[in-house]
Amino acid sequence: MSCSCGSSCGCGSNCTCGKMYPDLEEKSSSAQATVVLGVAPEKAHFEAAAESGETAHGCGCGSSCKCNPCNC
């Protein structure tokens, strides 16, 4: 999950705070989405890089489509 409050904020599948592409904004509906999860070997070096990139922005995705500590 990536969060950069400057241009866009992807807070999971239902939240895009920055509205970088407003035409692609998800509309709420009663339809349910199915998520298929798989199993793959652990890639420790990739995960460490992803985590360090997330903390470099200084914000994490919070509630109500906001990034903490900054609002998107």
Swiss-Prot record:
Protein name per its UniProtKB record: Metallothionein-like protein 1B
InterPro entries, from UniProt? Metalthion_15p (IPR000347)
Where would you find the membrane-spanning parts of this chain? none
Q: Give the species.
A: Oryza sativa subsp. japonica (Rice)
Provide the gene name from the record: MT1B
Q: What does this protein do?
A: Metallothioneins have a high content of cysteine residues that bind various heavy metals. Functions as a metal chelator of nickel (Ni), cadmium (Cd), zinc (Zn) and copper (Cu). Possesses higher affinity for Ni and Cd ions compared to Zn and Cu ions.
Lineage here is: Eukaryota, Viridiplantae, Streptophyta, Embryophyta, Tracheophyta
Family, per entry:
Belongs to the metallothionein superfamily. Type 15 family.
**Record flagged with keyword Metal-binding:** yes
* Domain of life of the organism encoding this protein: Eukaryota
User: In the UniProt record, does the keyword Metal-binding occur?
Assistant: yes
Q: Which Pfam families match?
A: Metallothio_2
